[in-house]
Amino acid sequence: MNQTLIQEILEVVEQAAIASAKLTGLGQKDEADAAAVEAMRLRMGKIEMKGKIVIGEGERDEAPMLYIGEEVGSGSGPGVDFAVDPCEGTNLCANNQRGSMAVLAASDTGGLFNAPDFYMNKLAAPPAAKGKVDIRNSATENLKILSDCLGLSIDELTVVVMDRTRHKDLIKEIRGCGAKVQPISDGDVQAAIACGFAGIGTHCLMGIGAAPEGVISAAAMRALGGHFQGQLVYDPAIAQTSEWADYTKEGNIKRLNEMGITDIDKIYEANELASGENVVFAGSGITDGLLFDGVKFERDCVRTSSLVISTLDSTARFTNTVHIKDGAKSISL
């Protein structure tokens, strides 16, 4: 991987964001996702690389494009594995709510954990708390540690939690400690990464979300130097989701074993979920969010706001791009 490839990866998420943003607020989440998928795949196809989707839109028979195992790119050049979510927060995009974005993680071949389409208990925290907070601890213990690491009182801390029934007790415990809870309906990738930057106002992400997005978050936090841990959730009684209404704990364990995951209770660190020598995260806003603005359509241009975090040069680059339309007469600053 090199800087030229990273620039092209940025353009991949920009094009996906623009495609989805054209459908923002129309209540068409599936169409917004499909538009992002098509745009992302089209731009990936122009990159000189031997790319492979390791986390994508589903299995080969479930998704027409960006399915798990699909080869992308020109077929020559460096080997790159991708974990992609072309429209993270499809409901947010459909309803014109904050936090939707096009995201991906990239690494050298074999550098990303091939997470199953399961749930994952996650803990994300700032670099100052790396290796000090622990997902094995109670929320109360972690808040005390986080308070010490950041030099803030517990009542000055804000914890992001997915607004789900399964988090009722977690939210009660956090608030019982005096910390603030910021519930989100979707989009925990951006919430996890935001914990890595001071001044945003969120200090920790706790709770259960999708496992594939956990890998993308882990890649970003590893490159940023933040804390991230994840543990797969296979018990429907814990996940408490209608998607698993017909699933059993035993059946899920069997599925994991068939995928080669035998240590089903393993706690994964960021450098295990994103283990490659070179790791890159790229995200571009579809709607406004914690980290960057959404796509803005103007008469003569389209503006995107994006973030690229890379281990290659230990940088986090916030990028505002003006995509100039044909025949443009005037571009404002």
UniProtKB/Swiss-Prot annotation:
Sites where the protein binds Mn(2+) 1: 33, 57
Residues annotated as transmembrane: none
Xref: Gene3D superfamilies: 3.40.190.90, Fructose-1,6-Bisphosphatase, subunit A, domain 1
GO MF annotation, one: sedoheptulose-bisphosphatase activity
Gene Ontology BP terms: fructose 1,6-bisphosphate metabolic process; gluconeogenesis; glycerol metabolic process; reductive pentose-phosphate cycle
Cofactor names: Mn(2+)
EC annotation from Swiss-Prot or TrEMBL: 3.1.3.11, 3.1.3.37
Catalysed reaction equations from the record: beta-D-fructose 1,6-bisphosphate + H2O = beta-D-fructose 6-phosphate + phosphate; D-sedoheptulose 1,7-bisphosphate + H2O = D-sedoheptulose 7-phosphate + phosphate
Chain residues that bind Mn(2+) 2: 85, 88, 213
Record-listed substrate binding positions: 88-90, 119, 164-166, 186-188
Pathway: Carbohydrate biosynthesis; Calvin cycle
Assigned keywords, A-Z: Calvin cycle, Carbohydrate metabolism, Hydrolase, Manganese, Metal-binding
CDD domains: FBPase_glpX
Gene Ontology cellular component list: cytosol
Disulfide cysteine pairs (residue numbers): none
Family matches, as PANTHER family: FRUCTOSE-1,6-BISPHOSPHATASE 1 CLASS 2-RELATED, FRUCTOSE-1,6-BISPHOSPHATASE CLASS 2
General function of this protein: Catalyzes the hydrolysis of fructose 1,6-bisphosphate (Fru 1,6-P2) and sedoheptulose 1,7-bisphosphate (Sed 1,7-P2) to fructose 6-phosphate and sedoheptulose 7-phosphate, respectively.
Summary of subunit composition and partner proteins: Homotetramer.
Matches recorded under NCBIfam families: glpX (TIGR00330)
Protein name: D-fructose 1,6-bisphosphatase class 2/sedoheptulose 1,7-bisphosphatase
Provenance organism: Prochlorococcus marinus (strain AS9601)
Organism classification: Bacteria, Bacillati, Cyanobacteriota, Cyanophyceae, Synechococcales
